[in-house]
Amino acid sequence: MNKKMQLYNRLHKLNTAQIITLGFAGVIILGGLLLWLPFCTAPGYHTSFTDAMFTATTSICVTGLVTVVTATHWTLAGKIIILVLIQIGGVGLISLGSIIFISLRKKISLRNRRVIQESYNMDRMGGMVRLVKKVLICMFGAEGIGAVCYAVRFIPQFGLAKGLGYSVFTAVSAFCNAGIDLLGEDSLAQYVADPIVNFTSVGLIIMSGLGFVVWWDIWDKIKRVIRGKLPVGRIFKNLRLHSKIVLMMTLILVVGGTVLIFLFDHGNPESIGTYSPGTKWMASLFQSVTTRTAGFFTVSQERFSNATYMLCLILMLIGGSPMGTAGGIKTTTVAVLLLSLKSNLQGKRDVEVHHRRIRDSYIRSAIVVTGMVLTVLILMSMLLCAAMPEAPIEDVVYEITSAVATVGLSRGLTPCLNTAGKWIVILTMYLGRIGPLTLGTAVTVRAQKMPADSHLAEEDIMIG
């Protein structure tokens, strides 16, 4: 009994960062063990423990790198388990726990509300349950609409049952930014010229990448316009600073990435050079969007030019926005770093944008998250190079960048990974999924609790 009480007390003392870290690890292990069971593997195939753990990790971390072909290797039971893991990874463990409490009609304690607050990196505790409910409504609603759009193409092609199953799986995978599909080894390549599949995928990826807070902010302003309380032309001006930064960064990255990919590869016959002008632009748009943590592709990654390769590395690292399903260091992190750089070059003490000042704690959080991701990227790239000396360095860097940013794109290296390489990528995906969220939350909360007048003596050092 004493041991049970000690265990309970230890679990009760866990902070948000520890809950997220242990929670993801626990679900990954459980999912891996389930996928390792014989009934999950299709006849004629064998699933090693490493491949089962790799698949569970890539699913719960909504990455999309796969060592086996999902469409043929797994049975229906295995595919359902993968889909559930993707949905859990997209919803988030904290939201999932809240769902269980709500469904059981149990009251969420003050401590658990604090966990929800810190996991979403929010300043106030009010409305936490409403927040989780809104997340679920938005997520399942968007996935449902996406499934209907995909069904328009998949049902005529594959039949009612299989087409409907493919539609639901692809919609969930696209919205959760997992990039796992049931269409075979070539992802969505057969639909490179199909507007329905392309724009449905792009729409789901961008919507989830914006983050739920931005959705609600825009919806709130639209309601005010409908009620006649706000002119249409002043919607953007009345948005929260967070929403303004996210929308501006997303627009710049999507449009800028599309234009640059088109310019770099429009004459490349290996990638998009042989397509019609409209298909070239559509393929460029898809590549620009999917590199920001989606993982689907309509053109094989190794076919793009070196310039597009470098651009994709940058887009993968940036990723999506907070409070969404995307990975990466996040658009707001990059914006804060760039604004901080601008302020320092101009000799300003404060970081300002849209007539607002950004807190120092958020600047520190942005630095920590970026530093952590770059550190993991460098270390894991070296380890994978050591484990697979025969692999080209550009493929290794692309693989690790994709893993740490939970993107899921590969230049063909994933199926060729040896056992050591697979475990390196598993660890990278795990660190990439829990790292930015955990460290960003921990640093911000800790900074807010520190006394403002607590300082040590200063001493000069040389920089640059």
Question: Where are the language model's segments positioned?
Answer:
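Membrane-proximal intracellular helices of multi-pass ion channels
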Residues: M1-G464
